[in-house]
């Protein structure tokens, strides 16, 4: 079973990074800020705004930077994903 987002929505999986302070202390998950880098796992077909088709600018496999508190977090098949609108994606990491 797959997740197929609708409209201009994108499904991403957050990329966990180990956070270390300048003094070398590794922070536990509870002390970290919410990650903002994610990998795109599914892309909707796009949408129509004011009669004009809005195409999706990201594709599956892209690494993206998203707004800090964007989207809806969901669990599916034991994995955690975030579903958000394309507008909540700030940049593609190349």
Curated annotation (Swiss-Prot):
Annotated keywords: Chaperone, Cytoplasm
GO biological process per UniProt: chaperone cofactor-dependent protein refolding
InterPro entries hit by this protein: Chaperonin_GroES, Chaperonin_GroES_sf, Chaprnonin_Cpn10_CS, GroES-like_sf
UniProt KW Chaperone keyword: yes
Keyword Cytoplasm annotated: yes
Xref: Pfam families: Cpn10
SMART domains membership: Cpn10 (SM00883)
Main location: cytoplasm
Coiled coil: none
SUPFAM superfamilies recorded: GroES-like (SSF50129)
One annotated Gene Ontology cellular component of this protein: cytoplasm
Description of how the protein assembles with itself and partners: Heptamer of 7 subunits arranged in a ring. Interacts with the chaperonin GroEL.
Function: Together with the chaperonin GroEL, plays an essential role in assisting protein folding. The GroEL-GroES system forms a nano-cage that allows encapsulation of the non-native substrate proteins and provides a physical environment optimized to promote and accelerate protein folding. GroES binds to the apical surface of the GroEL ring, thereby capping the opening of the GroEL channel.
Entry similarity comment: Belongs to the GroES chaperonin family.
Name of protein: Co-chaperonin GroES
Gene (name only): groES
């Amino acid at each position: 079973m797959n997740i197929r987002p609708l409209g201009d929505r994108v499904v991403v999986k957050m990329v966990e990074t180990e956070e270390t302070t300048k003094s070398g202390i590794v922070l536990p998950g509870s002390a970290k800020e919410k990650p903002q880098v994610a990998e795109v796992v599914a892309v909707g077909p796009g949408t129509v705004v004011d009669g004009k088709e809005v195409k999706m600018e990201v594709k599956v496999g892209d690494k993206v930077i998203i707004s800090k508190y964007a989207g809806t977090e969901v669990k599916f098949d034991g994995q955690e994903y975030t579903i958000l609108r394309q507008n909540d994606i700030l940049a593609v990491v190349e």
